[in-house]
Amino acid sequence: MYGLGLLPTLIIPSESVQLGVPEVNKIGAALIAALVLVPPVQAQSVKDQLAAFIDANADQYAEVAQHIWDLAEVGYMETESSETLQGVLRDAGFEIASGVAGMPTAFVATYGGGGPIIGIMGEYDALPGINQSRSSERDPVPGKIAGHACGHHLFGTGSVAAALAVRDWLEDSGTPGTIRVYGTPAEEGGAGKVYMVRDGLMDDVDVMLHWHASSANSASASSSLANKSGKFRFYGQSSHAAGAPWRGRSALDAVEAFHYMINMMREHVTPAARIHYVITSGGSAPNVVPDFAESYIYVRHPDPEESRRMFDWVTRIAEAAAMGTETRMEHEVIHGIYNVLPNEALARAMFDNLTIVGGVEYSAEERRFAEAIHSTFPADAPSIERAAMIEPFEVIEVGQGGSTDVGDVSWTVPTAGLGTATWVPGTSAHSWQAVAAGGTSIGNKGMINAAKTLAFTLYDLFTTPSLIDAAYEEFERRRGPGYVYEPLLGDRDPPLDYRASVVGGGNN
């Protein structure tokens, strides 16, 4: 197996999870103190200068990312992860607004003045139930109940790295404009970005950029699935299941009837629709008629209005299930997110810059680690050589696969993103292999490539007004005339306790 040997010496060891917030803030101060400033005379162009700045500080960025990897804090509980990123930005001269939109771990960091205003988003929440060491073999860490299986420790840090490089250039060049970093919590089911959009925190932004951990390098104009989710709670009457079942009313029967009718519904929705559920509570003993049961439902579709309609249908099914079992039903909308609105003009600019940056080149040790991880995949998995390649540019109008709260942002401001090979090619998101690679120098290298691509694209936007104009014209055309944004999740408050069962955030 290959593990910690891949880590740069500056990466904080796993003991960093014991640090309190004051110690975490020291990381930000130490990073700023250690930043290597690259004189403009050493660069052949501004983009060379931006790349040199990021390369010169790559070890410090890896330190921050791996500290957040160690913390592995779940949605709306990312206290130390958020504080770490805020500390880095604050010490670099950004003005910080913390706890925005009713979310204690959300923040907006601003540097500069005037227009254009370019935003860049960062995430930092981990996933419960998927923890793993920095090993190429399956190796859960005892006592750790979450892991960065979607690479958000890299996402947040890479976005900050890009912002710091561009901040340095803005200051040196005197270029007008504002860069804004949005710290967006709880992407994994908590829809943190939606509350920022709903509160108008992005209304004055000209363009928004983002990126994501991936097993390939790509920057395309692509969409995603809209998604509305909810918890459906059924209340019955307990009784002895053998002695007097007629006196009871089974909440579990209601859930089963609910799911049965949903499965009948599947025949009558379009092929692009996706409906999935889990029973989060179904009773505790077979000899007791359950008086409470709960089902957690996701409803997805490429069209947000169709997702909304299907969720309403599911709600009526739940009402019918309660009626048929003489139980009572309540439901709570947990989150609702739009599909991503593609923007080809921005995506092509991002793609051009990704092509300049290039793919991820493995060292001999990294290659051995990648081969060991790759051996756990099916025979038809993509070759590990794919990490060094750039995927062809595509325009994907109809969403496929997953969902993201970037969708709501993209319907509010022209938005584009990219993915870089932070994982071994063939890796699925939300897997132990993603956690493992993201904790090594492979993940760090992909993050640095993303930071450079974002920084280059930020430079293009600050210096090319016609690019912003083209992006906005496409944005308006795709939204259609008279468009008014209405959040799928309605007026509910952020579900700050939606991971409450995950005691203590990242570790227990």
Regions inferred by a protein language model and the residue ranges of each:
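Sec-dependent signal peptide recognition
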Residues: 5, 25-31
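Short, Lys/Arg-enriched N-terminal segments with co-localized hydrophobic residues
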Residues: 6-23
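Bacterial N-terminal signal peptides
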Residues: 30-38
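Sec/Tat signal peptide C-region and signal peptidase I cleavage site
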Residues: 39-43
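Metal-dependent amide/peptide-bond hydrolase catalytic core
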Residues: 44, 256-508
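Acidic/His- and Gly-rich active-site-bordering loop/insert found
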Residues: 44-148, 153, 157-178
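Sec/Tat-exported extracytoplasmic proteins
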Residues: 54-61, 65, 69-72, 76, ...
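Histidine/acidic-residue-rich, glycine-tolerant segments that coordinate divalent metal ions
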Residues: 139-147, 153-154, 170-290, 300
